[in-house]
Regions:
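Active-site-proximal substrate-binding groove within the catalytic cores of carbohydrate-active enzymes
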Residues: 3-185, 199-202, 206-207
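Solvent-exposed serine/threonine-rich low-complexity stretches and specific carbohydrate-binding patches
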Residues: 186-190
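Short beta-strand-to-coil "C-cap" segments at the C-terminal boundary of structured domains/repeats
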Residues: 210-214
């Protein structure tokens, strides 16, 4: 009774519905086991697993504290692999490491988790397996009170902005938006529902926007 255990997933091969009724993957695949892992592949994993695996997590090396790297591994949770691997100690210089950014990233991940547990995840882009495409999804709480948009512009992607339509927001309400790099705006629910533009100026870029009803 009340036994809890993690399934390491064996490269993702144990993410079957029977096993997942008893456990959840703190590390959803072996893709992230290496410091130079394929971030775009991890984004695609998360994008697709949201439809099938209610609780799942990737993990991040937090080296350097890079928003693109961190949020690429963001599922319902995230595991932090920051100490040591194959004899390498991380972070290599604890005095100069940006701990404040790491704390901000982990706090944002908690917000993502809480919204997902009370909301519906919405794919915003198609064919994330094709590297020239953005990879983006949103989640809106069932109450319509808050949600987030998480969007990646991949390396070599020529498109700097995309327009997304969100389901589940209140078209009659106003929403406060807060994002990375100091992004802040107030928009109507009608704008979020009919088409909200997200801009990511640089390729290999990410934007995470939280919104809440005023």
């Amino acid at each position: 009774p009340e036994l809890q255990f993690d399934t390491c997933a064996s490269g993702g091969r144990r993410l079957d519905y029977i096993t997942l009724s008893y456990a959840w993957p703190l590390c959803q695949s072996d893709c992230m086991c290496y410091r130079d892992h394929d971030r775009e592949a991890t984004q695609t994993e998360n994008f697709c697993l949201h439809d099938w695996v209610p609780l799942h997590a990737g993990f991040t090396w937090l080296e350097p504290p890079d928003d693109y790297e961190f949020y690429s591994s963001s599922g319902n949770g995230i595991s932090v692999k920051i100490w040591s691997f194959e004899g390498q100690h991380l972070p290599e210089d604890e005095e100069t490491y940006n701990w404040d950014l790491a704390r901000e990233q982990l706090n944002n991940q908690r917000k993502i988790r809480d919204i997902q547990l009370n909301g519906n995840i919405q794919p915003l882009t198609k064919h994330p397996e094709e590297r020239e495409n953005w990879c983006a999804h949103a989640c809106v709480e069932l109450s319509g009170n808050r949600g987030y948009i998480l969007a990646f512009r991949r390396p070599g992607c020529a498109t700097a902005e995309m327009t997304f339509k969100l389901d589940g927001v209140d078209a009659t309400a106003a929403y406060e938006l807060q994002g990375l790099e100091g992004f802040s705006e107030v928009v109507s629910g009608k704008t979020l529902a009919s088409g909200f533009q997200v801009v990511i100026p640089q390729d290999r870029g990410v934007q995470l926007i939280f919104f809440k009803r005023r």
